[in-house]
């Protein structure tokens, strides 16, 4: 059983989460952070990257609609965040789709220390250099062991690795968990994974480094449960209602609800 504490800390501390994210996800991510009690700051201007991370409690880097001028800003923000000691989350959206994305993520992983890397199976398989047929920015398909992919990424980059999907896989290289909550409606709305990465940033913001695995586990479980509850009673075509309902459920989440619905297995 989880011992949910980080959600309440977010609501009491209202951490500022710096997001360098994509144009598709920015609004949804900002509203989702507000729903859980965090405060979003969306900035990708190179001129601000020495300052904004110093004002923030976490940084989330998302390469979803990557533009060349943003890469240097991402690196500088990441280095500044490392310097001041706040956690950095990487969402390597579509990293396997193009050479530019692969090169960008390789540079980020070389120059920035990440507390967590969160993506779908295809994205983390690319980072782990495991064969997988990714489909653009979507997960695609493959036969690899997802738990092993998460383990490889976690060990290689000394971080928390999280793979989102029908089952979520979490690893810090030593501890491993699978989250069995969620809904098939998640991939039916754009930026649901991007919002999860932002939520992970908020949970890490109120945790100490030695608590990052537990914070990520609570973040991903809480988010999956919010989606599960938002989908109750909806038809598979009611994407708009799910979109709004997810924000509502994130705002209504409580530690009691998380414990009531959590379905987690450990390895």
Curated annotation (Swiss-Prot):
**GO biological process terms held by the UniProt record:** thiamine biosynthetic process; thiamine diphosphate biosynthetic process
> Could you tell me which CDD domains the record lists for this protein?
THZ_kinase
Look up the record and name the pathway of this protein: Cofactor biosynthesis; thiamine diphosphate biosynthesis; 4-methyl-5-(2-phosphoethyl)-thiazole from 5-(2-hydroxyethyl)-4-methylthiazole: step 1/1
Q: Which residues bind substrate?
A: 42, 191
User: Which residues does ATP bind?
Assistant: 118, 164
Any one GO MF annotation of this record? ATP binding
Database matches in SUPFAM superfamilies: Ribokinase-like (SSF53613)
Needed cofactors = Mg(2+)
Q: Which domain of life is it from?
A: Bacteria
> What Pfam family is a match for this entry?
HK
* Annotated InterPro entries: Hyethyz_kinase, Ribokinase-like
Give me the reactions it catalyses.
5-(2-hydroxyethyl)-4-methylthiazole + ATP = 4-methyl-5-(2-phosphooxyethyl)-thiazole + ADP + H(+)
Where would you find the membrane-spanning parts of this chain?
none
Q: List the keywords (alphabetical).
A: ATP-binding, Kinase, Magnesium, Metal-binding, Nucleotide-binding, Thiamine biosynthesis, Transferase
EC numbers for this chain: 2.7.1.50
> Which family does the record assign?
Belongs to the Thz kinase family.
Fetch the NCBIfam families from UniProt.
Answer: PRK09355.1 (NF006830), thiM (TIGR00694)
Q: What does this protein do?
A: Catalyzes the phosphorylation of the hydroxyl group of 4-methyl-5-beta-hydroxyethylthiazole (THZ).
Matching HAMAP family: Thz_kinase
Q: What name goes with this protein?
A: Hydroxyethylthiazole kinase
Biological source species: Pasteurella multocida (strain Pm70)
Tell me what gene encodes this: thiM
């Amino acid at each position: 059983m989880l011992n949910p504490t980080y959600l309440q800390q977010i609501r009491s501390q209202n951490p500022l989460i710096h997001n360098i994210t994509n144009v598709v996800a920015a609004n949804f991510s900002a509203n989702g952070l507000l729903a859980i009690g965090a405060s979003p700051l969306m900035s990708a201007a190179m001129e601000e990257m020495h300052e904004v991370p110093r004002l923030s409690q976490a940084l989330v880097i998302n390469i979803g609609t990557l533009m060349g001028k943003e890469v240097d800003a991402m690196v500088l923000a990441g280095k500044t965040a490392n310097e001041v000691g706040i956690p950095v989350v990487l969402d390597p959206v579509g990293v396997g789709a193009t050479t530019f994305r692969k090169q960008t993520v390789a540079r980020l992983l070389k120059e920035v220390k990440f507390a967590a890397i969160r993506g779908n199976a295809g994205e983390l398989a690319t980072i782990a250099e495991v064969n997988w047929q990714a489909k653009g920015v979507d997960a695609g398909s493959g036969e690899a062991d997802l738990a092993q992919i998460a383990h490889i990424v976690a060990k290689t980059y000394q971080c928390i690795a999280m793979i989102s999907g029908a089952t979520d896989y979490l690893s810090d290289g030593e501890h491993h968990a699978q989250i069995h909550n969620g809904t098939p409606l998640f991939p039916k709305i754009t930026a649901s994974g991007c919002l999860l990465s932002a939520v992970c940033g908020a949970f890490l913001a109120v945790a100490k480094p030695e608590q990052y695995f537990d914070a990520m586990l609570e973040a991903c479980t809480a988010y999956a449960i919010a989606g599960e509850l938002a989908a109750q009673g909806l038809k598979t075509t009611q994407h708009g209602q799910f979109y709004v309902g997810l924000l509502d459920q994130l705002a209504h989440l409580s530690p009691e609800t998380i414990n009531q619905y959590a379905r987690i297995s450990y390895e």
